[in-house]
Amino acid sequence: MMKFCSQCGGSIKFEVPKDDDIPRFICTQCDFIHYENPRVVVGSVPIYKDQVLLCLRAIEPRSNYWTLPAGFLENGEGLADGAVREAEEEALIKPIIGPLIAVVDVIHAHQVHVFFRAHLENLEFGTGKESLDVKLFKLSEIPWEQMAFKTGKIALRAQINKSEDDWQPVYKTLP
């Protein structure tokens, strides 16, 4: 919860600004309106032949559960560049980013998750700081019950259900 204005240090009130319909943090001194918008999570579905690379999370939330390499987009970074960076950080891979595969609104967390299909040219991978293990799984052997997040499951199912010629991305909303 915001207590002070980042522009002038003044106190903050939470109310609906004039000509708006959503409550916002507003400075009582300089009238600056502080907009809070959803955060973007970017990730990839790294494929090597008929296998997908998953990371066993070393951090909360959902430590010790499998996930796709993904994380928050940084300022000044494009979606695909962010997906590559996250894959490098979590699995020590350099994926070739392909088509957009899934976009998921995660309303309760104020996030939008964006996943790309990614190609791995070789078997060079390892555990980054946020991973306990990194492993390739055949698409028929994905550990669905041990997956960390619904959004990762949605992206994986989109990968499984796509043909090489069908790359219309999946769009879902989670409450």
Residue ranges and their predicted role:
Residues 73-158, 167-169, 175:
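Unchanged
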Residues 46-47, 54, 118, 136:
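Conserved hydrophobic "DFG−1" position in protein kinase catalytic cores
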Residues 1-3, 21-22:
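Flanking scaffold residues of small Cys/His-coordinated metal-binding clusters
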Residues 12-14, 35:
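Short functional micro-motifs and their immediate structural scaffolds
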Residues 29-53:
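Conserved N-terminal beta-strand and adjoining loop/helix that marks the start
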Residues 5-8, 27-30:
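Short cysteine-rich clusters marking metal-coordination/redox-active sites
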Residues 47-89:
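Conserved Nudix-box catalytic region and its N-terminal flanking loop in Nudix hydrolases
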Residues 16-24:
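Short linker/helix segments within small regulatory modules
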